[in-house]
Structures are given as C-alpha cells and as structure tokens.
Amino acid sequence: MAPKKGVKVAAKKKTAEKVSNPLFERRPKQFGIGGALPPKKDLSRYIKWPKSIRLQRQKRILKQRLKVPPALNQFTKTLDKNLATSLFKVLLKYRPEDKAAKKERLVKKAQAEAEGKPSESKKPIVVKYGLNHVTYLIEQNKAQLVVIAHDVDPIELVVWLPALCRKMEVPYCIVKGKSRLGAVVHQKTASCLCLTTVKNEDKLEFSKILEAIKANFNDKYEEYRKKWGGGIMGSKSQAKTKAKERVIAKEAAQRMN
C-alpha cells in the first residue's frame, strides 16, 4: 500500500493575552430581583398619571396618529417666538382697565360732577375681546388685526375665523395660547383678541408686525387650506411596516431572478 499523505493542521494564531491588573477585581452586576440597582432610564410611560393629564396625553397622541383635515391642521402653524413677543408688547400697551382702575375712574368722575366741573371722557383705545364682539368688528371692517388662540376647546368655536378674516381681508394670526391672551384682558382665557386702531407713536412698529403677519398667514392661506396633518405612527408601528416592506421587496427580487 502507498503511504498515506499527512494532512497538515493549520497552526492556530497566537492571540496576545490581555494582562489584567490584579488590584482591580471584576465585579459583574446582576440586575435581577434583589440584585444591583438598574441604570437610570426614562420611566414616564409607566407612570400612572391622573385622569386629566392622561386625557391630555391621549389627545396629543391621537392628533399625531389620525389624519387631521386642513381646517384643523392650520392651528398647528403658530406665530414664531420673536414676532409673538413683539406682538404681545404692543397688545399689553392697550390692555383694558381692570376693576380697581374702573372704580377709581368712576369715583373721580362722580367727584368732578359733584363739584360741577366738566368731566373729560375720551373713548380709550383698548384691545377688544369676546368671540361675538370680534366677529362683529371683522364683519364691519373695523378690525385691523385679529389674534386667535391655537388651543381653543372646542376648536369649532374659532375654526371658521381664519376664513372670515381672509374674506374680509383682515390680517389674522394664530398664537400660543388662550391663557396668554386671557392675561392681556384680565381673564383666565380668551379665544381671540382684536385691535381696531393704535396710537400714533406705535403705528410704525404695528405696521411692521402687520406685514410679517400677512406674509405668514393671509398670504399662505391657500397653502394651509390644502395641507393635511397627522398620519405619524409610533416607533413600533413604523418598525413593523419597514419589516413588512423589506419582506415584500425580497420576495419581488426573488421572483425577478
């Protein structure tokens, strides 16, 4: 018989062993029950929130998931922070009088009438509020600027207001939020505010604000009228959809081959 050829075994590569310092002991952590404390992470989704907060969170998520029609979606496009700050500075100059100021004015007026002095009473320039009042001013073409809150509940109260403003060619803007508008007029909340005129010293600043607002809202009305919102699914749902798409693409490629 012919001698068998020896099969050479491939020599194993020598790996350099890591030299560990004997002073440092390895102590792997066990994160099971009764073990080490787990690392900190965001646990907000496991918190049992109060019912009012739970409803707020669910409402916000639903608005992201469901398809939102353009009439409602336009209320997500609010005035930018810098422009809103300058707008509220102007609005605060024309705050209506509060109860204390009104009482003081009426007392002075009564004293003047008692003394027989003529009381000068000029109509003050103030911010108008109240949905019916603001609507009337828009219809009469007296409104120069309409400010609408983005978070009015129910939204049906003001959903038609941008269309009316555009029809009557009145500049309008949507701002955050109803409590901030309410603070201007000494109320808890306000759905909308309106300015009919301003003083001469504020006309230059007011005209600049109006130009910016027209460019952001009145001129873009047609664009916002066609833009739907929502339809954004969660991360788990998106991952499932991508996995399905990959499987379908793979099957299509196999068929082609």
Curated annotation (Swiss-Prot):
Q: Is Ribosomal protein there in the keyword field?
A: yes
* Recorded GO CC terms: cytosol; cytosolic large ribosomal subunit; cytosolic ribosome; nucleolus; plant-type vacuole; plasmodesma
Sorted alphabetically, which keywords does the UniProt record give? Ribonucleoprotein, Ribosomal protein
Per the record, the GO terms for biological process are:
ribosome biogenesis
* One GO MF term: mRNA binding
The family database entries (Pfam families) matched by this protein are listed as: Ribosomal_L7Ae
Fetch the InterPro entries from UniProt. Answer: eL8/uL1-like, Ribosomal_eL30-like_sf, Ribosomal_eL8-like_CS, Ribosomal_eL8/eL30/eS12/Gad45, Ribosomal_eL8/Nhp2, Ribosomal_eL8_euk
**Would you identify the family this protein belongs to, as annotated?**
Belongs to the eukaryotic ribosomal protein eL8 family.
Protein name according to UniProt: Large ribosomal subunit protein eL8z
Q: What is the lineage of its organism?
A: Eukaryota, Viridiplantae, Streptophyta, Embryophyta, Tracheophyta
